[in-house]
Amino acid sequence: MVAAKKHVPIVKKHKTTFARHQSDRFDRVGSSWRKPKGIDGRVRRRFRGTIRMPKIGYGSNKKTRFLTPSGHNAFLHNARTLSCAAGCSMQSTDPSAAEIATPVSSRKRIASSPARQADRCSRSRRSKFRPRRLRAS
């Protein structure tokens, strides 16, 4: 692996899940967040004891938002962007690193390609493939 870059310390804040108002009371109200827009809404008026609304203070630092723990920008998520990765973004001065997303099925093919030459390709050796065990009948 490539040594870590010098960067601002990466601080991962506690991630809060914001639930929709009264989604715990009714099945017909989904839990995904919606901003309350009613004129009398307690959540919109930020009363004590109500659920929290998303705001800018929950965000992380802009300089370190999408950095990997080694300080590189992750940019590769599919096999299509691999051709650009081999040519332009894998030079030694570029702060980018190829990070293969977890659900990418062509992970092994990407990892064995020439773009892996700079050894800045993360999540390449981990494979969730487990052979199925046959039942003895």
Curated annotation (Swiss-Prot):
Similarity annotation: Belongs to the eukaryotic ribosomal protein eL32 family.
Gene Ontology molecular function terms on file: structural constituent of ribosome
CDD domains: Ribosomal_L32_L32e
Keywords associated with the record: Ribonucleoprotein, Ribosomal protein
Signal peptide boundaries: none
Record Pfam families: Ribosomal_L32e
Gene, per the UniProt record: rpl32
Protein name in the entry: Large ribosomal subunit protein eL32
GO cellular component, one term: cytosolic large ribosomal subunit
Keyword Ribosomal protein: yes
Entry superkingdom: Eukaryota
Record-annotated membrane-spanning stretches: none
Region (Disordered): 95-137
